[in-house]
Amino acid sequence: MLFRSRALSGGVTTDKVFDIVRRVRQKVTLPMVFMTYANVVFSYGTARFLDKAAEVGIDGLILPDVPYEEKEEFAPLCEAAGLDLISMIAPTSHDRIKMIAAEAKGFVYCVSSLGVTGVRSEITTDIGAMVRLVKEANPDIPCAVGFGISTPAQAEKMAAVSDGAIVGSAIVRLCEKYGREAAGPIGEHVRSMKVAVLQKD
């Protein structure tokens, strides 16, 4: 929430984010996904937001505050726009993990621990067991692990038992620390993460 407040106070708007994505998409061919809150989508107009996201080159949408039971409010519109509504799976019962995984699109975001996003010194959840349950229900769906991954060692550990590691808050903190000069430190950090993740091979 702190990062969101700073973005808003800095003049960031949804349309400005769309413009940034449009420019990035001109040089980047990798899939790109928005992670935002449902109220951002609602306030822009759900269908309008999703159509615009697809237009500028977004491939999927993660709404961490929308539980599985409420996803049908967004899923048909995402499908119509050509976007994957990405499922998040937290440490929970085996039956629930399999239920969510069975209908997952794009990839599954495996939440490493309960709580809010951010940097953690240690991740204790048995991610390997979660991933195995997901694959039992949906063998072809990729699983990426997020929440609390901030170091190359953590990324390597998570990638060893899943298909990838998601890093967010650590990069935002580099933006906060270096401001307009953040591109270099971010690039260095991402490269170190990439090297660590590839160690699993």
Which residue ranges define each predicted feature?
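Active-site mouth loops of central-metabolism enzymes
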Residues: 31-45, 86-92, 120
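Glycine-rich phosphate-binding active-site loops on the catalytic face of alpha/beta enzymes
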Residues: 56-62, 67-70, 112-119, 147, ...
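Short, small-residue-biased leader/transition segments that mark boundaries at the very start
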Residues: 1-2
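Catalytic cores of alpha/beta
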Residues: 92-102, 137-138, 149-165
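Active-site-adjacent beta->alpha loops and helix N-cap segments on the catalytic face
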Residues: 9-22, 42-47, 63-80, 93-99, ...
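Conserved, mostly hydrophobic/aromatic
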Residues: 53, 100, 158, 168, ...
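C-terminal helical cap(s) of enzyme catalytic domains, especially alpha/beta-barrels
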Residues: 173-201
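Hydrophobic faces of well-ordered beta-strands that scaffold small-molecule active sites
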Residues: 32-36, 61-63, 85-88, 108-110, ...
